[in-house]
């Protein structure tokens, strides 16, 4: 960081061929990661810390005091806590040898116990270049005035694994705003591939868990083959509808704001939901449709504002 400039750069030193960084939501939870943290320990590390802060009544403590409480050697506890710090559960002040418990630790334990909602949002940035290049490999840049975090090298984002909503940013670029909102251009896939949106300047609102689709280029729908056929994973095999919907404006509600984990589907049925705001059109001037014989100025299908819910299970007949 050049203190005379407004940008803080994150990445790897010159000579690195592949630079990777991971950015996670403070409410991110993965069961596999929870189990991985447990390892061979008798007590889960997060539970051990929670027991300590309950006993002492403080979330800021010295490493040595925690080692005595846990009964493990100091050197082992230092490694133990360093690992948790790298994963964002605690802040480790190596100079003072003190620990401050972070929000993510509490969120993880609430998610595990079923007492709190969670999300699966994370960003993996990978930037690759020649190892001969003598410049820093930049994964992200934070503007300290606007608080915008520009991130490069992000090929895919999972917004909801239960609703199967994924984003594919154009050029791997996104701009993360405050409180996990972010802006990107590219493709959104929802409903296990049934519903695909292409466009620019899409704005994801974290708290309300929806996407403002500012500039939609087109909407591509896919439906199950009839009779129903399934792939090796048990998913229905889909076929794309030949025509796409254009001149669309609207939004995509991924799930209820209090059900970002998607675990309470019975309480909040019908998601994901796409809603169009204004009239839209289907044109038939693609080369794949009778070699563009139908000019869009003469032939089109006019759609009034519409809504499609349950994007993961609609059928051709239902449409």
Enumerate the predicted regions with their spans.
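Structural signature for solvent-exposed beta-strand/loop edge elements and short helix-capping sites
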Residues: 1-319
């Amino acid at each position: 960081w050049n203190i005379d400039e407004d940008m803080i750069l994150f990445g790897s030193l010159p000579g690195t061929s592949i630079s990777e960084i991971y950015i996670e939501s403070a409410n991110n939870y993965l069961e596999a990661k929870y189990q991985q943290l447990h390892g061979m320990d008798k007590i889960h590390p997060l539970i051990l810390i929670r027991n300590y802060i309950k006993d002492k009544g403080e979330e800021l403590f010295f490493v040595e005091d925690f080692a005595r409480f846990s009964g493990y050697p100091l050197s082992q506890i230092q490694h133990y806590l360093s690992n948790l710090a790298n994963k964002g559960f605690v802040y480790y002040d190596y100079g003072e040898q003190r620990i401050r418990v972070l929000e993510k630790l509490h969120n993880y334990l609430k998610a595990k116990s079923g007492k709190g909602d969670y999300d699966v949002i994370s960003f993996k940035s990978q930037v690759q270049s020649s190892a001969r290049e003598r410049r820093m490999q930049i994964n992200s840049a934070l503007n300290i005035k606007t608080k915008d975090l520009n991130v490069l090298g992000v090929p895919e984002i999972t917004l909801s694994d239960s609703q199967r909503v994924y984003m594919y940013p154009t050029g791997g670029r996104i701009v993360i705003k405050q409180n996990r909102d972010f802006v990107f251009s590219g493709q959104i896939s929802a409903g296990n591939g049934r519903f695909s949106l292409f466009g620019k300047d899409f704005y994801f609102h974290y708290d309300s868990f929806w996407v403002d689709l500012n500039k939609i280029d087109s909407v591509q729908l896919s439906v199950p083959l009839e009779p129903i056929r399934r792939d090796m994973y048990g998913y229905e095999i889909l076929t794309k509808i030949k025509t796409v919907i254009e001149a669309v404006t609207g939004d995509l509600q991924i799930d209820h704001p209090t059900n970002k984990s998607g675990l309470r589907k019975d309480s909040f049925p019908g998601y994901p939901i796409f809603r169009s705001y204004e009239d839209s059109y289907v044109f038939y001037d693609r080369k794949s449709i009778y070699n563009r014989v139908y000019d869009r100025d003469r032939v089109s299908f006019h759609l009034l504002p519409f809504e499609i819910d349950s994007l993961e299970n609609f059928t051709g007949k239902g449409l």
